Curated annotation (Swiss-Prot):
It is a multi-pass membrane protein. Belongs to the complex I subunit 1 family. The chain crosses the membrane at residues 3-23, 77-97, 104-124, 151-171, 174-194, 226-246, 250-270, 289-309. It catalyses: a ubiquinone + NADH + 5 H(+)(in) = a ubiquinol + NAD(+) + 4 H(+)(out). It is found in: Mitochondrion inner membrane. This is NADH-ubiquinone oxidoreductase chain 1. Keywords: Electron transport, Membrane, Mitochondrion, Mitochondrion inner membrane, NAD, Respiratory chain, Translocase, Transmembrane, Transmembrane helix, Transport, Ubiquinone. GO terms for biological process: aerobic respiration; mitochondrial electron transport, NADH to ubiquinone. One of its GO terms (cellular component) is respiratory chain complex I. The lineage of its organism: Eukaryota, Metazoa, Ecdysozoa, Arthropoda, Hexapoda. It comes from Drosophila melanogaster.
């Protein structure tokens, strides 16, 4: 019985995430529309609300094409695996339920984000297109660079709360959010989240002027839709993780979802506001600024814990 309940819970979570992704794309198109002083999608149904579902039907009913010289199997598997990973990573969220509150949640998140690099790399390589390969290489270099700082910052918090289980973030933030006492870290984490999800101003994987569309240039119909959904599911997850780490994480509270919506909106807001970085500046930022910052904070937290234990 418990297994059936867990299975139903997993299916519900996946369905809810996919519906959220659909409405996040609609929100993005609306917000970008208003930023550019136009309406955005407003013709389909009431205020354009069914628009993402119409887009999904259109994309999945189009003919599946593939480049003649591409590596057929890996070309098709990489978008599927990409979406699978971005849905699978939701397991580490602290939902106060047996299935979704396991003790190595932080480690599980790092494993899933590291595996996400391979899907981009395989998608770029198997297309057998120079544009796709260059886009894939850029995305891999960028993701690996920023993952180091991401892991160090997460490790700092794990030292602070003393567990890999994400549920401890809730216990430690009952009286005060970590955002208030660690505001610089929150800003750096937000920047790293933007870089990890290949969003503006770090969207070098899909620089239109240089790489046409990046690693997904040869994908059409269903393959493109799966890559697109995986990207937006990871944006939602990174927004939720920001709320868990910095804004307290009582998932049964409506306020939590309002915070999640606001952080997702910030991702879109940044896209509508900032231009793309220069590539050397991106690498400089990752290795010289963020890495030294996160290492200093990690050493500070380790020293802080040692001091606490020596005093006790």
């Amino acid at each position: 019985m418990e297994f059936i309940l867990s299975l139903i819970g997993s299916l519900l979570l996946i369905i809810c995430v996919l519906v959220s992704v659909a409405f996040l794309t609609l929100l993005e198109r609306k917000v970008l529309g208003y930023i550019q002083i136009r309406k955005g999608p407003n013709k389909v149904g009431l205020m354009g609300i069914p628009q993402p579902f119409c887009d999904a039907i259109k994309l999945f009913t189009k003919e599946q094409t593939y480049p003649l010289l591409s590596n057929y199997l890996s070309y098709y598997i990489s978008p599927i695996f990409s979406l699978f990973l971005s849905l699978f990573v939701w397991m580490c969220m602290p939902f106060f339920v047996k299935l979704y509150s396991f003790n190595l949640g932080g480690l599980f998140f790092l494993c899933c984000t590291s595996l996400g690099v391979y899907t981009v790399m395989v998608a770029g390589w198997s297309s057998n297109s120079n544009y796709a390969l260059l886009g894939g290489l850029r995305a891999v270099a960028q993701t690996i660079s920023y993952e180091v700082s991401l892991a160090l910052i997460l490790l700092s918090f794990i030292f602070l709360i003393g567990s890999y289980n994400m549920i401890y973030f809730f216990f430690y933030q009952v009286y005060m959010w970590f955002l208030i006492i660690l505001f610089p870290m929150a800003l750096v984490w937000m920047s790293i989240s933007l870089a990890e999800t290949n969003r503006t101003p770090f969207d070098f994987a899909e620089g239109e002027s240089e790489l046409v569309s990046g690693f997904n240039v040869e994908y059409s119909s269903g393959g493109f839709a799966l890559i697109f959904m995986a990207e937006y599911a990871s944006i939602l997850f990174m927004s939720m993780l920001f709320c868990v780490i910095f804004l307290g994480c009582d998932v049964f509270n409506l306020l939590f979802y309002m915070k999640l919506t606001f952080i997702s909106f910030v991702f879109i807001w940044v896209r509508g506001t900032l231009p793309r970085f220069r590539y050397d500046k991106l690498m400089y930022l990752a290795w010289k600024c963020f890495l030294s910052f996160s290492l200093n904070y990690l050493l500070f937290f380790i020293g802080f814990k040692i001091l606490l234990f020596s005093l006790l």
